[in-house]
Amino acid sequence: MPKPLHALLVLALGGACLSSPAFADDADRPLLLTFCDAANIKESACTKAKGYPDAGNRACDVKLTADRYSGRFVASGNPLLVVNYESGCEAHATNDGGAVMFEQSGGKAICRGFAPGSRVNDCVVLKGEPQDQLACLTGHMGQGILESGVAQMVFTEGYNKDIGIATDMLLTAEDSNGAFGANVVTCKEGPKNFELSDIKAGPRPETVMVKAGYADAETIKKACAKGFPKPKQTFGKLTRGDAYVPEGYEKRSTFIIDLVTRKVTPQG
């Protein structure tokens, strides 16, 4: 189930938030107080978040996690702290949670909105002018297929000061070991990425590096000519025109991704 390389998925944000007491990097309570009554706070969780998007009559819980990134992600605004959260109001399809944005201003935090489904796991902040950039690894498992990618998180400010996020996919990968027992390529298609990991700042401004396991044209040609041994254990039946690439027979390299030109090149 390959996806277009350059996909832009806009995630709507909702809910107004209140300003908080003094901001503290080492404590979640001041952050939680921006959208939660004190009586509803327990450790890093709020049992009833105010202004949660599409909550209706539900009492939506929000539990802040350790994944968080700070930077000036809106050129005209103050620095933002972007924090992952878990919520029982979100399903597997929306990653069981999302991210919440806090504006850092005058030693205080102001909640600027929730982004259900938009998690900031394994990210890197690229400092720059007029604003910083946030690039993240993404991942979603469905029916044994692990889809991953490298995405640039694009922040926008609405008329009501809420912050919106758009996830701009720069590179995608598909690992089908869980569905077929091995990775799979389509013989009439081009190179395919299987996995992406270990994102870091790149060697030049506005670039990132990521480790990749992939099949190039040579690998696909050999797989389709049955030049690889059969995987030890397979599941289901391949579609006509597909072929296995057993574990250990994929190519490995580090890719450099330019966030401006969107060009992807192997390192070296």
Positions of predicted regions on the chain:
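Short N-terminal edge-element motif at the start of the domain
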Residues: 55-129
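Sec/Tat signal peptide C-region and signal peptidase I cleavage site
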Residues: 18-24
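Bacterial N-terminal signal peptides
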Residues: 8-17
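Acidic/hydrophobic-patterned starts of short beta strands in beta-sheet-rich repeat architectures
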Residues: 72-86, 127-140, 152, 198, ...
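Bacterial N-terminal signal peptides that target proteins for export
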Residues: 1-9
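Short, flexible beta-strand-to-coil junctions
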Residues: 84-93, 103-106, 138-142, 209-222
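Long, charged/polar, surface-exposed segments that mediate recognition or autoinhibition
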Residues: 95-99, 107-109, 125-127, 131-138, ...
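Acidic, small-residue rich beta-repeat scaffolds with periodic aromatic anchors
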Residues: 24-50, 142-268
